[in-house]
Amino acid sequence: MIEIISNITSQDNVSTNKNNSFFNIINSSYLLKSTFSRFNQYFLNKKIEFDHIIAEEKKENKDKIVISSHFIVNYLLNILNQKNTDFNSKNFNNSKNDQIKKKKIDNNQVNL
């Protein structure tokens, strides 16, 4: 499964609807590649085993297997739900929010 994710991120010709403006925004901002790399890193750290995934052959080029991006994202999210995985958004986003020193402001100190 991890090899499939790597192959998808390296392909520019992922089967998405190019006429759909939402996918154009995703493709232009590289958000899709970022999502796949984060899933890849998260699942490697958790050592989750993937089930087999069905691929769809592209009719014009029979040597190349193309998997739709929304199918992969939905599949990965379903794995989290089915395996009852403890999904912590701080770990997934690599948030450093805990290291930031927070200061409380007293209402008397605020000058309006």
Curated annotation (Swiss-Prot):
Region of interest (Disordered), ranges: 90-112
Domain of life: Bacteria
Protein name per the record: Uncharacterized protein BU078
Species this protein is from: Buchnera aphidicola subsp. Acyrthosiphon pisum (strain APS) (Acyrthosiphon pisum symbiotic bacterium)
